[in-house]
Amino acid sequence: MNNNTQESKIQLEYINKCTELVKEKYEKAPAFFIQNAGCQMNSLQTDTVAGIVKSMGYTEVSREEDADVVIYNTCTVRENANLKIYGHLGHLKSIKKKNPELKIVLFGCMMQEPEVIEKIHKEYSFVDLVFGTHNFHKFPELFYRSLNTEGQIIDVWKESDEIVEGMPSDRKYSFKTGVNIMFGCNNFCSYCIVPYVRGREKSREPEAIIEEIKGLVADGVTEVMLLGQNVNSYGKTLEHPVTFAQLLKQVEAIEGLKRIRFMTSHPKDLSDELIRTMAESKKVCHHLHLPMQSGSSRILKIMNRRYDKEKYLELVDKIRNAVPDISLTTDIIVGFPGETEKDFQDTLDVVEKCDFDSAFTFIYSKRSGTPAAKMENQVPEDVVKDRFDRLLALVQEKGRKASSRFEGTVQEILVEEESREKGIFTGRTEYNLLVHFPGCQDLIGKYVKVKLDTCKGFYYFGSLAE
């Protein structure tokens, strides 16, 4: 992994060049529209691009029609995500006819697919700039080229080990944010496209992560979410390896930081050291997202998850013994190729035994480019729908039961924003439970004690306790 400070200087210089160019080109501040699709790591990169463009002198608008630059950060986990982007481009074509000066920028995971690039080049020639995940750090330079060029620029790298630090970012919240600690994935689950578009795992140096978080805390951040496709394998690729548990301890030592969250954790790599660290920590939130995907050992093997039903259940028991009040959430796929009723019953059995606080349930979606897409024995749609409905009913029942344990208790809430209903504010407990309560604007970004009065399943209505 190459933490390239020289490249950082180069890109910051291109930001300055773009700023001067924008001043020359526009009489008043130009506008940009940006839209994110996909995971929280994508969201962080969208924040970075928004921060860069704002630093160049652009102001953000909420409609493509009002923008001088339209930017899409794309996701390709499901093929439907690709279709949505093509739909957006059809809409943008008519906008660009009315405003030929409009710049259209596409980046992210979808752009790493050769067939996508070919299609954009042939059918969407009005798109101005296209780049991928491996040269994301080159955005200021590429955008400068685009501002000086009439034609289409496509610059997609197959791989890169560079991590560029110190770029501007535009955070949604001033008091909490995500921090990427690593990039890429080495797991190659048979249904997942991510390793092919994000590349192999590369970890940031712990010193760079700590420096970034200290800067965020100095800027008012009190809660961070440490992000990676599999945070449990953090540090293995570094010249001087560091475990994720060791990194957590370093982050915990940062004065002024109150809460630490992280995701995603692959069950095969969740160590006893990490469980101990969670149990002993005063800042790591007692919420763990532990994707199960299936409760069937047979299906898990075909998925290439590298654990089985028994190991997953043992892991959950170990976690609950160490952290009894843990809030446990998961991901579950229904209808994976070859899934039988017995396999599905194994999944229901795990849900029964694990008492998840909530679960993200998905119907299997065939993703071209993955081994699973070529598998035979695709499960009929009506069977999948029936299983999905049965699973969802159980997940909701167990979730309501798990959440109800907090009813009548007083919890510390980080207040995030005012809801659509005036005077009602929302925040989260350390268990990642959403709470609505009457309050005022001054509470946003603060930690307050709230009595959880009424459980509504996966969220609560409460009242200030002080």
Question: Which residues does each predicted region cover?
Answer:
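Conserved SAM/AdoMet-binding glycine-rich loop
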Residues: 103-106, 113-115, 218-341, 352
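Short flexible coil/turn linkers enriched for glycine and charged/polar residues
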Residues: 172-175, 185-187, 284, 294, ...
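Short, solvent-exposed loop/turn segments at secondary-structure boundaries
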Residues: 81-83, 200-207, 235-241, 302-305, ...
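Terminal RNA-binding accessory module
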Residues: 374-466
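Conserved, mostly hydrophobic/aromatic
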Residues: 189, 209, 226, 262, ...
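Proteins enriched for Cys/Gly/acidic motifs involved in redox and nucleic-acid/cofactor modification
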Residues: 1-227, 232-234, 273, 288, ...
